[in-house]
Amino acid sequence: MDSCQICMEIYESLIRWLRVLQLSAPHDNEKDLSDGVALAQALNQIAPEMFSDSWLSKIKSDVGHNWRLKVSNLKKIIEGVYVYYQDILSLNLAEELRPDAMKIAEKCDGFELGRLLQLILGCAVNCLEKQKYITQIMELEESLQRNIMAALQDIEYVWQGASPSRNSINAPSLDVKTLQEDRDSLAQKCHETNKKMLILIEEKSVLQQEISKLQVIIERYEHPNLIGDDGTSLGPIQLGSSRYNDLRKVVDGLKDELLQAETARDDLKMKSAMQEKEISDLQVKIDELHSATAEIAQLKDEIDILKEANDKLKICETQLQTYKKKLEDYNDLKKQIKMLEERSAEYLKQNSDFEEEAKKYAGLKGQVELYKKEIQDLHAKLDSEMGKTMKTEFEHNQLQAKLSAVQREKENLLSERDALREACDELKCGQAAEDSESGRNTMSKELHSNDVRERIERLERENKALREGQGGQTALSQLLDDANQRNDKLRDQLKSANQRIMLLSQNHSDEISSKSDMDIQLKQALELNEQRSSQIDEAQSQMGQLQAKIANLESALVAKEQDLLAADTRYKKCVEKAKEVIKTLDPRAVNEALLLEKPPQQDGSEGSSTTGGGDASTLTAASASSSSARAPMGVQEEQLIATAFYRLGMTCQREAVDSRLALLSGPGQSFLSRQRQPAPRKPMNMSYAKK
């Protein structure tokens, strides 16, 4: 265990010596050194004439957990170290001392890694810059110096051909892993020999039993005077006796069995020889397969190396393309720089010209400032006047809208007054006819449904609300028209201002002497342009708000019109159903209905004329048609609904009576009793219709 501790101390001191070299690759522990990158960098630093940059590029840096690439890197390093010792140092190293790359790559074996570090230390001590590395070693701690000197002594013993020291890492007696493997193999062999010994003991016991049996048989044959199995004395064996003949037969049978056993033994020998030949052939094949697997592993390593080379080639191609693009961009930038330099030269010339002109016009600055102040005052006055004019125009437009609304209301009131007068006249004329039919009408008025009246009143209220909304909509449309007109005026002013700017710019190139005046006019025009554009933006925002309001009102109006149309259709359907019911129930009421059709038609025409007169000024053609269709319910409709209700009640009562009679005349009655039962009554209107 002391020797193992010494070996580990030497190994750790060699790793600490590697840290002095200041390598870029990680080299703190066994895993970092197992890929061989740090060791290759150390060799490149120690002997660059042998381990050049091209040789270092062959070492794969991005290895990861691929042990095959690690093995290939370590083999290259070990081969390079051996070549360095042979060619440059003229020292022949034994193949027994070659570090095992497989153990370092797979298991991170510290013993094999220590051998490799010893060889690298020998390269550093015997290279061209050995004085530098020796001084670095001398600057280390004393314990590290002792361990490194012990490692160097072991290498010198190898060079001189002497046996290595006890402290050497190369001593096979210190290989703990090999000793453990030998111990395991010996234990396995002991176990196998114990098994064989037990089998042999069993065979020995079986053979002893057979020998005892044979001895008993021999004793029987040697002593013929013995008593047989049946208890009789056998007597002596003589030629020609029956016993002799029996024994002779037994001997012949035994000889035959012996011959058969010998033939079977020969056959088994032949078979065993054949099987041994087959086993030898199979062993040869197994050896060939092992060699083939080794070749396959080498080919896999080469394939991995080629794959990495291919990946690097692709990366290089992409980098090359990017560099080409960058070169093209660089050429374009050069051209742009030339253009910019030319422009900068032109700008410098222009600046010098402008500075000269500014010196000329320096005396006119005072006058220009006075003119600016006057222009600002005039602009303020103009803005105030424009605001006043806008307010007056807006108030004027509002008053005009109110006046037009009042005139429309006046016209509506006049038309309603005329319609009411006509209705009063018609009511006076038709009062006599109504007195004659008072009996019928009183009944219908009493039974008139309140739901229908409430519905009619609600529809009239909605119609009025729509008319008022239409009036507000007209006012909004007028405001929108005014805003559009203002917007058009501002656009015309903006166009004129732009034309003025163009004229001023042309005059500026022609008249250099009046440049200051033209600049002032240009600034004024630009300020006017900005003010007009701001006014246009405000007008456009107001116009957008008005348009949104108009769209909302139009959508509400469309929804109301749809509701009114649906109510009209429902009302017409109800009237048609009532007429059909009256026709089917009582044909005599048809003539009365025909007589009563004329006055409601007149009332409907009057209502349509009155409402049409009111809607002609406020609503469009579509709203006028819908309002004329929504006339109030006439007398005929009320009477029809009442009669239909009474007829329906009578039919329901008759059906109830018939059902009760049918229940009374059940299936248990006789034929005569059923004949005596009264027949169900039939409605008179049906018989009358048949006639």
From Swiss-Prot:
Region span, Disordered:
431-454, 595-633, 667-691
Positions with biased composition (Polar residues): 667-676
Q: Does the keyword Transferase apply?
A: no
Instruction: Supply the source organism for this entry.
Output: Culex quinquefasciatus (Southern house mosquito)
| Quaternary data | Homodimer. Interacts with microtubules via its N-terminus.
Alphabetized CDD domains for the sequence:
HkD_Hook
Which GO biological process categories is it annotated with? cytoplasmic microtubule organization; cytoskeleton-dependent intracellular transport; endocytosis
Q: Which GO terms describe its molecular function?
A: dynein light intermediate chain binding; microtubule binding
Q: Where in the cell is it found?
A: Cytoplasm, Cytoskeleton; Endosome
Q: What is this protein called?
A: Protein hook
The entry's family comment says: Belongs to the hook family.
Q: Where is the composition biased (Basic and acidic residues)?
A: 443-454
Pfam families from the UniProt entry? HOOK, HOOK_N
Function statement: Involved in endocytic trafficking. Probably acts as a cytoskeletal linker protein that tethers endosome vesicles to the cytoskeleton.
Main location class: cytoplasm
Cite the record's Low complexity compositional bias ranges: 616-629
Give the matching PROSITE patterns: CH (PS50021)
Q: What keywords are annotated for this sequence in UniProt?
A: Coiled coil, Cytoplasm, Cytoskeleton, Endocytosis, Endosome, Microtubule
Q: What residue ranges carry the coiled-coil annotation?
A: 136-568
For whether the record's keyword set contains Coiled coil, the answer is yes
Spell out the GO cellular component terms annotated for this protein, sorted alphabetically and separated by semicolons. Answer: centrosome; endosome; microtubule
- Domain comment text? The coiled coil domain mediates homodimerization.
Question: Residues in domain Calponin-homology (CH)?
Answer: 8-124
